[in-house]
Amino acid sequence: MYSGICIYMFLAMLSTSSSGQQATGSHNENPVATELEQSLTEHHRHVRVPSSAGQLKPIQRLDGNVDQKANIGALLAKYLQQARKGPTGRISMMGNRVQNIDPTHRINDRDYMGWMDFGRRSAEEYEYSS
């Protein structure tokens, strides 16, 4: 309990100190940081400026979206084909294992084949001969 409180306090101090450094760091005249901020704001301004080239960008985006939609459609079709074929891989191996269990096995009447629900077994108080 004490260690949990110490860890919580340490994380709280760490987060407050890092947020304090970010606030003071923006007021410092760091030439690299201010140059980076200016270049980013100029980049955003250039992107948002409407022009004839800016009008062509949505058309290119639509073409990209069409390609993405086609790819997603193809993946969905593959998935549906595999789902219709039935389970494959590890799931099918587990299914085969469940079918191969001996009918006289003592956990045959459980809901989950292959593992025991211990709470249910103890609640029902089955007596097995060992």
Swiss-Prot record:
GO terms for cellular component: axon; extracellular space. Coiled coil: none annotated. GO terms for molecular function: neuropeptide hormone activity. PANTHER family: CHOLECYSTOKININ (PTHR10786:SF0). Residues 1-20 form the signal peptide. The keyword Signal applies. The modification Phenylalanine amide is found at residue 118. Keywords: Amidation, Cleavage on pair of basic residues, Hormone, Secreted, Signal, Sulfation. This is Cholecystokinin. The modification Sulfotyrosine is found at residues 112, 126, 128.
